[in-house]
Amino acid sequence: LAVALGADATFVARTMDRDPIHIREILSEGNKHHGTSFIEIYQNCNVFNDGTFSVFTDKATKPITTVNLKEGEPLVFGAENEKGIVLEGTNPRVVDLNSGDYAKDDLWIHDPTDRTKANILSRFFDDPREEMHFPRPFGVFYKEDRFTYEDVLNEQVDKARADLGEGDLDALLRGNNTWEIQE
């Protein structure tokens, strides 16, 4: 996901095959996005990597190893949503909501239009010194409405037609703007 964000992708998300409702929502949202959608899918393979993502899909471990990214909602996780993530500058930190030191109002509120925060989320599990310190995020990391190549191309063609007319291929080929290559 970090590579997709670094390549300036306009829709970046992650989902898993074992959660049919979530995968349907993410694929539908990616399909509706105007532009290219990059969606990482954690998919089990019974032959080559059976159970590789089970820590994120099993009912017993999923609540403590994953966090669902929902626009406008705080990043909470845990068996009873007792943990949350705060952002201090650009440094995320896991906090215990039962300690009394933090409330849900103190937590990081997910904003999928913030590229900087999306980059931070994409690296939650990449620190080898702190294995499973952060939960694995699932959902839409980043989305941006922006023009696409097709938009610009069609605009250019429409402008040329408006300025120069429809054009005539036969007139172009028979006109004086051609040349002959001789040996």
Segments predicted by a language model, with ranges:
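Conserved acidic/glycine
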Residues: 64-65, 69, 74-183
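Glycine-rich ThDP/TPP pyrophosphate-binding loop and its adjacent helix/strand module
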Residues: 1-113
